[in-house]
Amino acid sequence: MSKKRVHELGKQLKEQGIELSNQELVEKLHALGYLEVKSHSSSLEDDQAHAAYEKILAERKPKPAPARPSGPGFVVRKRAHVEPPTVTAPAAPPSPEPEYAEPQYAEPQAEQAYEPEPQAAQPEAGAEPAAAPEPPAEAAPLAAQAAPSPGAEAAAPAAPQAQPAQPAAPAAPPAPTAQPSAPPPAAAQPRPPQPSAPSRPPPPGYRPAPPPGARPPVSAAPGAPGQPGAAGQPPRPPVDPRTLRPTSTQAVVISRPLVPVRRVTPPTSARQQFPVAPGPRALGEVRELKVVPGSLGREREFIDVSRDKRRGRQPGRPISEEQAKSLSGKELLQAAISDRAYIPIRGKKKKPTKKGAKTQITEKAEHKKVIRIEESISVSELSQVMGVKASDLIRKLMQMGKMVTINAQIDADTAATLALEHGYTVEKKGFEVEEFIPEVEVDESKLVIRPPVVTVMGHVDHGKTSLLDAIRQADVAAGEAGGITQHIGAYSVNTPQGPITFLDTPGHEAFTAMRQRGAQVTDLVVLVVAADDGVMPQTVESIKAAKAAGVTILVAINKVDKPQAAPERVMQQLTEYELVAEQWGGTTIMLPVSARTKQGIPELLEYIALQSEVLELKANPDKLAAGRVIEAKLEKGRGPVATVLVEEGTLRVGDALVTGVHFGRVRAMMNERGEQVDNVGPGYPVEVLGLSGVPVAGDEFDVVEDEKAAKEVAQHRATKQRQKELGGVKKATLEDLFAKAKTSAQKVLNLVVKADVQGSSEAVSQALEKAATKKVGVKILESAVGAITKSDVLTAAAGNAVIVGFNTKPETEIENIASQQGVKILMFGIIYEAVDRIREEMAGLLEPIIKEKPLGKAEVRQVFNIPRVGQIAGSAVTEGVVKRAGHVRVVRDRKVVFTGKIGSLKRVKDDVREVAQGFECGIGVDGFSDVKQGDVLEVYELEEIRQSLD
């Protein structure tokens, strides 16, 4: 159902003559029960608006507006008394004549009550008679004054009868503005009105009218000529009006309104006759006047339009060019003034002033009171949408037990609670990722066998990379720092059983996330356990990660060629973690292998192929590619480089790719041997170039239709991630306040971590954060991939941080900038070396413990005052040794009166560093000159002891 605004309702009422201001209309609607209306822009349903319109119209019935005039203005005529001409005619019986009532000029209804003259019966083409409005209530007294005699009232009903035409009269066309003539005497027949043009020559027998003083008086008594009571009297002789002279002109304006000007003159074709009371006077010259505005627009003037009528120009219409040529300048001016008769005259509109101006109360529409958010919204954004001060929202949140700032993110439920108090509702809007990344149904006919993905996991130094080197017939382990793997590597190996994709994961405890990612994307897990070392912590962690991912575990007991190898002991230890060998009746395959002698490697590959057949690994290569990011890094000259594993579809160069908050178009792809490839099928790893940033290892990637769709998905994920990071608002508890106060007193080491790959950056950051203790904390200001840049140095300088570089080095220029800024750069290639060095930096932040170490005592025997030197205490060393660099306490009567440092130490006249027990010396105390005989000087030194982190 449609709606109507309040100001539209006001316009509709104004058309009916009811003028209400916006505020008055709002108050009126409130009085009628429409309390939801707040201002002129508020909306009402159509049925409500119609009901309110009818109620207001019923309460304030406007007076009927007078009819719109069809003519140019009022018509005011002048009348002259004429004597009927003497006409010799044969005697004839008098015929009944119509009776006339007194004319009522102000009554539009009088026009409707009488028939027009015969010559006006044929109107002009296209002219329509104007409908007369209803007579106003005040017309009755006027009619009573116009017809005071009872006879006139009795003659009124006979007025509507039509006047008979006079056949003997000449057929002269009447003027366009000819008006109804007065009724003839009782003995005369009605005649058509005479034209008022004075230019015609007088007929023969013309004689001037007698002067006004010689005219007999008109009697108003009943029975006098022209009165209703004279119906039975003999008629007076007719008088030719052309023989009479017109009297003085008298203009009468009947019921002229002020503004707007209303004209009641009907068109010429529809003009009606107005009967007048019979009397001795007849119509003479007729002048037509029109009411027009004055020259200044503040008054009214009467303009004679009779001459315009005689010249064939209709009043109130603009003159043509031909007519303008025949008029003088004065006549043109008068015509221009007369054309302004229809211009409404209004007073000057007053400019609105600020003083006294009422404030319009506006309110948003209901459909605008809906706030749509996704996961969260900031306090500032919510305040702007609702038009509420942010401080009020923060105060309300504090009352709810939530400590927030103006830029803090609040969840949708909290926002809904705040919005409900201000009349708003909150709706969660979702971003449908399925619109860009649709799910494709599996078509069994298009599935093909893909290579198995095998992840090699285990403890550090148990030979995982060496085992892969033996399978690939390569030597990757020799090139790794410290002989340990610190990156996750992906290799595709062609074996007699078919292609197999291997993922090599680090075994160090810091690379837990890498091992978990490897377990998530794999089909099989080869758990490598050293036969001489047994099950270790990272071995147990790898077992848990594989079981959590729900993948099959195949155990390879490595280093069986060593003399101290004990495979049986390893198998026994694995049973504690529900891994029972097939030889012992279990379901887990356990093979003894040796990476050095390549013992058991063919059997391992055969078991991998057998397990892949059991799992029925298939994929559809015809669909859009999808998979996971295994590793990512930032290389100079190449930009962001991501190592991805294609799980479904085929990845091609030029595809639009989106992963996490990054997107791009595949510019190039390279396999593990550095060879460029154009497409990669499911089950194979590849390096991808062309992303907008370094993605997070472990994120999924998808190929979409175009780069625009990829950008939209990435931007949505970035916004959602930011809202999630800022949206964590927790209730403030007393425990949190105590913990915060305790943390504020804790020393914190700020770090900026830069690594060669994203996985190493993540692992190093986690390892360094775990090194924090109760005394010293570790805060990672920034963790990124790539070389150390000037921006990293400036960030570290601003945060008083140390830069940790892992497998990356800064340029010489960057080292100079760091030296100028006082920033320390530490570079490492092995992760445990980085952890040990950072612990030393953390210990350096702790203030050392000051410990007092006694040296000796001396007794003052004599005091010497030496000019320009000061007071010297001649003392004898009674205990230990007195050193010149030591501290001293002056003890008098077992009370310490001063604590300071020894300023000078002499023996006889020589300065000495120390004086042993049993010798005398002179001791000068800095800042103290009140040494007395008998005082004891206790000498000691302060020793700093470095605190431990534990």
UniProtKB/Swiss-Prot annotation:
InterPro entries per record: EF-G-like_DII, IF2_II, IF2_N, P-loop_NTPase, Small_GTP-bd, T_Tr_GTP-bd_dom, TF_IF2_bacterial-like, TIF_IF2
Family membership noted in the UniProt record: Belongs to the TRAFAC class translation factor GTPase superfamily. Classic translation factor GTPase family. IF-2 subfamily.
Region listing for G2, in residue ranges: 483-487
Compositionally skewed regions (Low complexity) per UniProt: 101-131, 139-169, 216-233
Region: G3, residue numbers: 504-507
HAMAP family for the chain: IF_2_B
Record key words, sorted: Cytoplasm, GTP-binding, Initiation factor, Nucleotide-binding, Protein biosynthesis
Lineage of the organism: Bacteria, Pseudomonadati, Myxococcota, Myxococcia, Myxococcales
Chief localisation class: cytoplasm
Region (G5): 594-596
NCBIfam families found in the cross-reference section: IF-2 (TIGR00487), small_GTP (TIGR00231)
Domain tr-type G: 449-618
One GO CC term, this protein: cytosol
Region (G4): 558-561
GO MF term list: GTP binding; GTPase activity; translation initiation factor activity
Function: One of the essential components for the initiation of protein synthesis. Protects formylmethionyl-tRNA from spontaneous hydrolysis and promotes its binding to the 30S ribosomal subunits. Also involved in the hydrolysis of GTP during the formation of the 70S ribosomal complex.
Subcellular localization(s) per the UniProt record: Cytoplasm
SUPFAM superfamilies linked to this entry: Initiation factor IF2/eIF5b, domain 3 (SSF52156), P-loop containing nucleoside triphosphate hydrolases (SSF52540), Translation proteins (SSF50447)
Region (G1): 458-465
Binding residues annotated for GTP, in chain numbering: 458-465, 504-508, 558-561
Positions of the UniProt region annotated as Disordered: 57-254, 304-328
Pfam families registered for this protein in UniProt: EF-G_D2 (PF22042), GTP_EFTU (PF00009), IF-2 (PF11987), IF2_N (PF04760)
Name assigned to this protein: Translation initiation factor IF-2
Top-level lineage group: Bacteria
Gene source species: Anaeromyxobacter dehalogenans (strain 2CP-C)
Gene3D superfamilies: 1.10.10.2480, P-loop containing nucleotide triphosphate hydrolases (3.40.50.300), Translation factors (2.40.30.10), Translation initiation factor IF- 2, domain 3 (3.40.50.10050)
Bias (Pro residues) ranges: 170-215
